[in-house]
């Protein structure tokens, strides 16, 4: 079946926009093709510095013919209504069909040729493409990320003819801006297109560009007994800057190695898009860097390396100046400047935030580790944790906040635990980032994140959908991970509102789902009013294991049956009060369940009190047999009112007893 190939060639597309642009192009094309009944066998998109490409395999040459039935006026309706319907359909009265007293028209619609639909589709995509930022060029009214230069659109080897703001579609593409002959080349299909680009020094696929960069970079480093410091984010960006990647290894002045390694790496990455290089023996940074050129230089990259080394030297000289100047001022002496730094218009200055975090750290410390020394150090670290925000290095490299504070604290000779807490109080900053494990560092990190959550929820700035401008989901997940991994028994209700506690429940459910655990059980346990995350997760894990057993699954079914009966009765009026009785003449199964519930009631409390959740589940399991037998042999809705009321009391007792372990009504499975 025919193939569609589309290339949108433009000036340089920002690297950060390319991956999303490829996804958007695929989504828009799929939606529009599907709306026209055109379903490709395969569809793939590519993005690079100068081009967006789409290839769709297995498209039909035209739409299938369609038949539509239109409902018209009722038989006997005014003549004007019928005439209007005939004009609309283009039919005569004899061609209408009467059914159930209504006129119907059957319209035969021949399928449109695919190229005609594609032409409309491409123009619509060009005019509605969701670039984060776009521009107009010259007299064109078309908004595109950068000036659009050429549109290649070929279907089944032939040009799909159309024009958008003076740019006519064609069957020509271009190679590398500098390494090709500069002449357009003819394209008939994707295979020829990809081969033509490769022959003209363009690697179409971003993943292939990344593979080439990594492979060549590691080879260069290995030849010099060095090791590349891999950086996935930087690799993604660099692969979006070059069409023909050529790694080049350069040298820098070894004197700069006395700077903190984070400063060197950040200066390389942020300002120059260089990779750092280290000594594989000791793991320390080596006086070298790796840049990725967009051309294969005749001198092997020597001139490129020399020029880049000169630029890097200037950058690192600036960083050294800031580093030297920053160490002349104590962190404590920087606090006054935080009064001039706004944290948020509704939440005051950064100095006020520091005061909140400092106070919160003092309250949290006993729960993390109940020692006076821990509290003293945590309060000191919390007070100084944000002081580096007004330092020169952090002003230049905001991503180093906290890290630089740790270096400055170390230079002042502060306690190592205080240094560590300042350095790591932002952690974890992502799902793969380690949590601070020392008691002082964990306390300060918790205080920082809890203040963020309480403050922003307090002014109504809550995450909605995909929008989370203040990273509150990350903050909540950070609190959860710190608490769980340090086994901190933290009563969250003492520090957060019910709304924030519900938010923690949601994030904990997400975390457990990502770990392949029963996330629905989080709501079932949170419903008990517990706010100790360590205890909640322990209960969830044991409950999850219990529900996988035959006893657990059957008992859950019995619980839901009991609850459904009770809910139906509650709609009629209040349930009978009091305890279920051992009624004379009652069925043996009823008496057995009364005894089983009473025994469970007596043993369940102590097990839960000592947090023996496995023991609690063992006790629950003993209820399964009596519950099954009761429902098999006993009629709850007895004609005898006293019997019926006693059995309803018994079911309520079963519900309440199980409800001490979890709210089983919220369990989905």
UniProtKB/Swiss-Prot annotation:
EC number: 6.1.1.14
PROSITE patterns recorded: AA_TRNA_LIGASE_II_GLYAB
Catalytic activity entry: tRNA(Gly) + glycine + ATP = glycyl-tRNA(Gly) + AMP + diphosphate
Pfam families referenced in this protein's UniProt entry, alphabetically: DALR_1, tRNA_synt_2f
Any one GO molecular function term: arginine-tRNA ligase activity
UniProt keyword annotations, A-Z: Aminoacyl-tRNA synthetase, ATP-binding, Cytoplasm, Ligase, Nucleotide-binding, Protein biosynthesis
GO biological process: arginyl-tRNA aminoacylation; glycyl-tRNA aminoacylation
Keyword Ribonucleoprotein recorded: no
GO CC term (a single one): cytosol
InterPro entries xref list: DALR_anticod-bd, Gly-tRNA-synth_bsu, Gly-tRNA-synth_heterodimer
Family: Belongs to the class-II aminoacyl-tRNA synthetase family.
Subunit structure: Tetramer of two alpha and two beta subunits.
HAMAP family: Gly_tRNA_synth_beta
Protein name: Glycine--tRNA ligase beta subunit
Gene coding for it: glyS
